[in-house]
């Protein structure tokens, strides 16, 4: 049984544009936002994917003209995956645990679920299985961290083509160099590459507001160092349309079914 969901890219040859070379089905599914490549391989292996009506096989290649269908089991598995919003405290790492430091996912327990969570999702230990951070937040930073089982959300937030905004409040010390604020907005480079334009404004005499559309390692701290400032506190308060809001530090809640980044 298949769903009435058809995923197909435009027929480029109809516009006089040469067809692209065939690529792996799993890559095409990720490009279309159906799921992550790892999830695609799992669905294909289970026989949950059809190409032009025929059950797909691992390693199969497709073109933009091919029709891709997911069956009911794949759709149900996606629907059961959860995304969790955590207000990460200092001292926890976003990803795998490191020496002397705990992983943020260890905070996802029934006891730490925020009593203001209105999602009506009952916590189950399986919700921590394959739960991965969709983006980093430094060990010495606090605020909104997204942990998800859904590869589509991870791709949206941290994929190569991600354009999701991330908003931060940043406390600083030091003396801002001449033209420093303008450089923070546009004109700095890290790791030999120009940074995308940002939105950086003063909130008060020692706090800046950053809105970024990329996430290089320790990006804000390194940007500030380039203009004579030292970051003494960093808090992420928004990712896309999802705000940290009143979520207490160390607590978490589920992303609601109608929640969209």
Model-predicted regions and their roles:
Residues 19-261:
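Basic, flexible Lys/Arg- and Gly-enriched helix-loop patches that mediate nucleic-acid binding at interfaces
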Residues 5-18:
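Short, Lys/Arg-enriched N-terminal segments with co-localized hydrophobic residues
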């Amino acid at each position: 049984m298949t769903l009435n969901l058809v995923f197909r890219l435009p027929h480029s040859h109809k516009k006089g544009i040469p067809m692209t070379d065939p690529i792996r089905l799993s890559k095409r599914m990720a490009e279309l936002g159906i799921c992550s490549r790892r999830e695609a391989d799992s669905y294909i292996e289970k026989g949950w994917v059809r190409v032009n009506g025929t059950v797909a096989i691992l390693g199969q290649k497709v073109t933009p003209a091919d029709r891709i269908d997911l069956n009911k089991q794949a759709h149900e598995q996606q629907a059961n995956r959860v995304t969790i919003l955590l207000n990460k405290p200092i001292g926890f790492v976003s990803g795998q645990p490191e020496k002397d430091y705990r992983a943020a996912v260890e905070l996802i327990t029934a006891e730490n679920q925020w009593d203001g969570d209105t999602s009506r999702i009952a916590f189950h230990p399986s919700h921590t299985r394959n739960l991965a951070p969709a983006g980093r937040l430094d060990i010495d930073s606090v605020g909104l961290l997204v942990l998800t089982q859904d590869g589509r959300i991870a791709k949206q937030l941290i994929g190569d083509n991600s354009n999701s905004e991330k908003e931060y409040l940043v406390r600083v010390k030091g003396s801002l160099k001449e033209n420093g604020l303008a450089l923070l907005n546009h004109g700095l480079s890290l790791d030999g590459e120009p940074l995308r334009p940002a939105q950086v404004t003063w909130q008060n005499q020692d706090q800046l507001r950053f809105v970024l559309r990329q996430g290089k390692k320790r990006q804000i701290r390194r940007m500030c160092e380039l203009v004579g400032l030292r970051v003494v506190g960093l808090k992420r308060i928004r990712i896309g349309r999802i705000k940290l809001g009143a979520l207490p530090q160390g607590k978490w809640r589920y992303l609601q079914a109608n929640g969209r980044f």
